[in-house]
UniProtKB/Swiss-Prot annotation:
One of its GO terms (molecular function) is translation elongation factor activity. Required for accurate and efficient protein synthesis under certain stress conditions. May act as a fidelity factor of the translation reaction, by catalyzing a one-codon backward translocation of tRNAs on improperly translocated ribosomes. Back-translocation proceeds from a post-translocation (POST) complex to a pre-translocation (PRE) complex, thus giving elongation factor G a second chance to translocate the tRNAs correctly. Binds to ribosomes in a GTP-dependent manner. HAMAP family: LepA. Residues 7-189 form the tr-type G domain. Belongs to the TRAFAC class translation factor GTPase superfamily. Classic translation factor GTPase family. LepA subfamily. It holds the Pfam family GTP_EFTU. It comes from Lachnoclostridium phytofermentans (strain ATCC 700394 / DSM 18823 / ISDg) (Clostridium phytofermentans). It is an enzyme of class 3 (hydrolase). Disulfide bonds: none annotated. This is Elongation factor 4. Keywords: Cell membrane, GTP-binding, Hydrolase, Membrane, Nucleotide-binding, Protein biosynthesis. The keyword Ubl conjugation does not apply. The keyword Hydrolase applies. Its main location: membrane. The lineage of its organism: Bacteria, Bacillati, Bacillota, Clostridia, Lachnospirales.
Length: 604
């Protein structure tokens, strides 16, 4: 291990839009370098969560080390760091890129460049990585490699004439990619004898070993027994074991030196101590400065999670704690709701992150959950000069105490075929978007730039974008900052009682429309009772929309055959009195489906 020549190490990652074949290319590289035989291969080797395979996305960054015998007769060590491609995990991507010297840009020969590709390429170029393109899926009937090559050169401005034309699925031209990794990606620099400086690009929790740190050693050497110090969190621990990555397994080694990628286990019990992007150094001989680029990741989207069965509250807490061991960006704190009982207010990086956590809780821990509408962090400035950060609409102060409110904005890039430009611009306008500009990529596609409120895109913007563009639009965003906005709290009252779990903060202009649609939706979902149930949407004390669930009633006139009208009226009045009394003391059963349906207002 210690005799590894730095010049023969290649640290690289693969960047691509969802579905352009990133994980498949990683599979082929692993297979071609003989790390796994074709019998041992399973598709998407590096995506080892069931959820990752099903959705076809990479959630956790994975790493694998393989040895390649090149045509020049030398053996090269490849460290492939597989990165998540989704915008929610942008910070994880940037840290994984910082651990590499180069990147392979995979572009689909049929679809060309997409918004996510652009975002990740710019991220790679910001980290001064050497990027070389690979055109994938050339076996498709609709493939047009020459058009895609021209597009890469025009839009990104990197040389693409000698880009390998491959089919990762069928294993065509993979050798050429391996040779280009050797020739185009530089070897790592770094002095083995300098003080230790290593970058954490991921960490996982193992129930036997504790926290396992995935790191790239930039300077110096780390051995067993070294006392490590995390520069951002200040945590210290002794190295118990270290080594390199095989597919799905850890291979222990004697030491890790400058340029190498590997894992370290130390006697750490909490992933929060080993934050992604932090610098690891030797506690006795520390490096002078930490590596640049570390930032604490803050959740963007919050929502309430409640067990459908109140007795499962401790199980939900245990499950969230276990997930948090592996995912430092997940935050949660206990909260109570009058309608839903005990639960947690959870913070996520974005909507995909929320969906994944929810699905994992339901699958891996067999929990039945009710989630409230997602919310972002609003800044509320009070008349007494105090500033509050609000994630839960129930915590909003009285309107008389609020001077003004601010909401987060994002800068969005939407890639769309020209025939749908009008439809997408209308969608952005509906969502209070501010138009920034538009560029035509070639005659058939355009890149739209908009500033949008985060509040408007966390609900169902992505679904609406896909449906209005028949699945052709792709979308990427980054945070812009806060702007003042006319926001109000929309309350839902069922049978004259406020249901806190259905309240949310909305822009004043869209309050009426949203309230009306929510009332209509709830009317369909709440079953009829023996008394009539008013469903109202209110802003402050003003009711802005109302629907009524009609009462089920017994036919009290069935036993009157003919007879005087006053007799019938007496029976009807008696029934009416009974219903009125019932409405005052009756409880309304709100099914779980009603809470879920409110989240999906735009799917009608």
């Amino acid at each position: 291990m210690s005799g590894i020549d730095q010049k023969r190490i290649r640290n690289f990652c693969i960047i691509a839009h969802i579905d352009h074949g990133k994980s498949t290319l990683a599979d082929r590289i692993i297979e071609k370098t003989g790390l796994l035989t074709s019998r041992e291969m399973s598709s998407q080797v590096l995506d080892n969560m069931d959820l990752e395979r099903e959705r076809g996305i990479t959630i956790k960054a994975q790493t694998v080390r393989t040895v390649y015998k090149a045509k020049d007769g030398e053996e090269y060590i490849f460290n492939l760091i597989d990165t998540p491609g989704h915008v929610d995990f942008n910070y994880e991507v940037s840290r994984s890129l910082a651990a590499c010297e180069g990147a392979i840009l995979v572009v689909d020969a049929a679809q060309g460049i997409e918004a996510q590709t652009l975002a990740n390429v710019y991220l790679a170029l910001d980290h001064n990585l050497d990027v070389f393109p690979v055109i994938n899926k050339i076996d498709l009937p609709s493939a047009d490699p020459q058009r895609v090559i021209a597009e890469i050169e025009d839009v990104i401005g990197i040389e693409a004439q000698d880009a390998p034309l491959i089919s990762a699925k069928n294993g065509i031209n993979i050798e050429e990619v391996l040779e280009q990794i050797v020739s185009k990606i530089p070897a790592p620099k770094g002095d083995k004898n300098a003080p230790l400086q290593a970058l954490i690009f991921d960490s996982i929790y193992d129930s036997y070993k504790g926290v396992i740190i995935f790191c790239r050693v930039m300077e110096g050497t780390v051995k067993k027994g070294t006392t490590l110090k995390m520069m951002a969190t200040g945590a210290t621990a002794d190295v118990v074991e270290l080594g390199i990555f095989g597919p799905g397994q850890f291979i222990p080694a004697e030491e890790l030196s400058a340029g190498m990628v590997g894992y370290i286990t130390a006697s750490l019990k909490n992933v929060k101590d080993t934050r992604v992007g932090d610098t690891v150094t030797d506690a006795e001989n520390p490096c002078k400065t930490p590596l640049p680029g570390y930032k604490k990741v803050n959740p963007m989207v919050y929502c309430g999670m409640y067990p459908a069965d109140g007795a499962k509250y401790p199980d939900l807490r245990d499950a969230l704690e276990k997930l948090q061991l592996n995912d430092a960006s997940l935050q949660f704190e206990p909260e109570t709701s009058i309608a839903l009982g005990f639960g947690f207010r959870c913070g996520f990086l974005g909507l995909l992150h929320l969906e994944i956590i929810q699905e994992r809780l339901e699958r891996e821990y067999n929990l039945d959950l009710v989630t409230t509408a997602p919310s972002v962090i609003y800044k509320v400035y009070k008349t007494n000069g105090e500033m509050l950060e609000i994630t839960n609409p129930s915590n909003l102060p009285d309107p008389s105490e609020i001077e003004h409110m601010e909401e987060p904005m994002v800068k969005a890039e939407i890639m769309v075929t020209t025939e749908f430009v009008g439809a997408i611009m209308t969608l952005c306008q509906e969502r209070r978007g501010i138009y920034l500009g538009m560029e035509y990529m070639e005659s058939t596609r355009a890149l739209l730039r908009y500033e949008l409120p985060l509040n408007e895109i966390i609900y169902d913007f992505f679904d609406a974008l896909k449906s209005r563009s028949r699945g052709y639009a792709s979308f990427d965003y980054e945070m812009k900052g806060y702007v003042p906005s006319e926001l109000v709290k929309l309350d839902i009252l069922i049978n004259k009682e406020e249901v806190d779990a259905l309240s949310f903060i909305v822009h004043g202009e869209s309050a009426y429309e949203r309230g009306r649609r929510m009332c209509e939706k709830l009317k369909d979902e709440i079953p009829r009772h023996l008394f009539e149930i008013p469903i109202q949407a209110a802003v402050g004390s003003k009711v802005i929309a109302r629907e009524t669930v009609k009462a089920m009633r017994k036919d009290v006139l069935a036993k009157c055959y003919g007879g005087d009208i006053s007799r019938k009226r007496k029976l009807l009045e008696k029934q009416k009195e009974g219903k009125k009394r019932m409405r005052q003391i009756g409880n309304v059963e709100i099914p779980q489906k009603a809470f879920m349906s409110v989240l999906k207002l735009d799917e009608d």
